[in-house]
Amino acid sequence: MARELISKNATKSVYRDGDKAVKVFCKGFPKAEVLNEALISARVEAIGGINIPSIQAVSVEEDGCWSITRDYIEGKTLTELMKENPDKRDEYLNQMVELQLMIHSKTCPLLNKLKDKMARQISEMEELDSVNRYD
């Protein structure tokens, strides 16, 4: 079965390949970021209770681009559902809120804290002087 393009942006393309989804990163995409994404997914998988596609492989494609292969989960996006059933918009939004609440109720001690990540990224910004970085 040939890969079917599902989604594409400036840094990656996602393909369906049978019962797998393959995210292929563009040439030059940092290896550390690819491996970190896979590690975060594996850690979230390990806590259980959140239906995320399992990581099956992290590899280098024939063209030298990194890829992450996951199980493909059949279904429609929230946008597709809302377009097909506009009368159920509130119901879908409530389901999304419940999902977010459930996700945030989980503890995954091995994940980096978002606050720390944001502080690090802000401190690395040369465009901001130290006074604005502090604010």
Regions found by a protein language model. Name each.
Residues M1-L5:
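Conserved N-terminal boundary motif of the eukaryotic protein kinase catalytic domain
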Residues S7-L35:
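ATP-binding glycine-rich loop module of kinase domains
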Residues C26, E45, M82:
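Short, flexible helix/strand-to-coil boundary loops that buttress conserved ligand/catalytic motifs
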Residues I40-I50, I103:
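Structural motif at the C-terminus of the N-lobe alphaC helix and the adjacent alphaC-beta4 loop
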Residues S54-W66:
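Short beta-strand micro-motifs within the conserved protein kinase catalytic domain, predominantly
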Residues D63-T77:
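Conserved short submotifs of the Hanks-type protein kinase catalytic core
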Residues T79-K115:
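Conserved kinase catalytic-core helix
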Residues S105-D135:
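An alpha-helical support segment within catalytic cores of ATP-dependent transferases
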